[in-house]
């Protein structure tokens, strides 16, 4: 009886591994450039490339199976913002736009869904919101 249970567990583990391999495996994300100055309340756009198995730029894993990277950032208070990336014309290249609601340090990562291998980057330092421009007096 125990032997049958172990066999079932082994078969299920092999099937799960096979499904992950057929789904495209894993990927890494490389940024176009280091983040510049970021201010709370202003959109920040980041460009990056998804490299399947760390080498090949990839937009999709086959018909009906697009790569859909998700940027997730969290601050020390636990506040979370997300941005779904959109593909550009260059294979494997994406851009995401996110607006941070407050200043401070934000931990952030990009998940190259449905591929495994989230990429965690150095924390972002978000500056205080810029003062609103004074309205013209008429």
Segments and roles (model prediction):
Residues 1-8:
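Bacterial N-terminal signal peptides that target proteins for export
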Residues 8-17:
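Bacterial N-terminal signal peptides
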Residues 20-138:
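N-terminal soluble domains immediately following signal/targeting peptides that reside
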């Amino acid at each position: 009886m125990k032997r049958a249970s172990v066999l079932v567990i082994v078969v299920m583990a092999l099937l799960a591994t096979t499904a992950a391999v057929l789904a495209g495996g894993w990927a890494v994300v490389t940024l176009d450039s280091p983040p510049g100055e970021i201010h709370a309340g202003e959109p920040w756009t980041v460009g990056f490339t998804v490299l399947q198995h760390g080498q090949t730029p990839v937009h999709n894993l086959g018909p009906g199976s697009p790569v859909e990277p998700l940027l997730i950032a969290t601050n020390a208070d636990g506040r979370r913002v997300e941005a779904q990336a959109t593909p550009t014309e260059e294979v494997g290249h994406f851009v995401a736009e996110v607006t941070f609601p407050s200043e401070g340090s934000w931990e952030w990562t990009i998940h190259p869904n449905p591929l495994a291998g989230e990429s965690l980057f150095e924390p972002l330092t978000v500056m205080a919101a810029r003062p609103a421009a004074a309205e013209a007096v008429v």
